[in-house]
Curated annotation (Swiss-Prot):
InterPro entries: PCD_sf (IPR036428), Pterin_deHydtase (IPR001533). This is Putative pterin-4-alpha-carbinolamine dehydratase. It catalyses: (4aS,6R)-4a-hydroxy-L-erythro-5,6,7,8-tetrahydrobiopterin = (6R)-L-erythro-6,7-dihydrobiopterin + H2O. The keyword Lyase applies. Disulfide bonds: none annotated. Keywords: Lyase. NCBIfam families: PRK00823.1-2 (NF002017), PRK00823.1-3 (NF002018). One of its GO terms (molecular function) is 4-alpha-hydroxytetrahydrobiopterin dehydratase activity. Belongs to the pterin-4-alpha-carbinolamine dehydratase family. Its EC number is 4.2.1.96. HAMAP family: Pterin_4_alpha. The keyword Nucleotide-binding does not apply. It comes from the Bacteria.
């Protein structure tokens, strides 16, 4: 089971994650999760990205909560088993940023 991060680790990892963004939309903390809305040029690009991320999520054995409408994908990451944010959440978020 993944270990829940302490507050200082979360702050440092969130800052490092937001240094990777290529758009103007940062990841935001929301309680025991991090969230971001990704915007794409079309539905097919949004869905294609989700398909790629699903493969990475399966490899990490860590799955996002996400919602797609047309060209937008809202992502929420948390580790339910740990009761909060873990390294898995930030690893998956980093993959999402790199493949956007």
């Amino acid at each position: 089971m993944a270990t829940k991060l302490v507050e200082s680790e979360i702050e440092n990892k969130l800052e490092a994650l937001n240094a990777l963004i290529t758009d103007d939309t940062p990841w935001e903390r929301s309680g025991d999760s991090i969230k971001k809305t990704f915007t794409f040029k079309s539905f097919i690009r949004a869905f294609g990205w989700m398909s790629q991320m699903a493969i990475w999520a399966e490899k990490l054995k860590h799955h996002p909560e996400w919602f797609n409408v047309y060209n937008k994908v809202e992502v929420t990451l948390t580790t339910h088993d740990a009761g909060g944010l873990t390294e898995l959440d930030f690893s998956l978020a980093e993959k999402m940023e790199k493949f956007k």
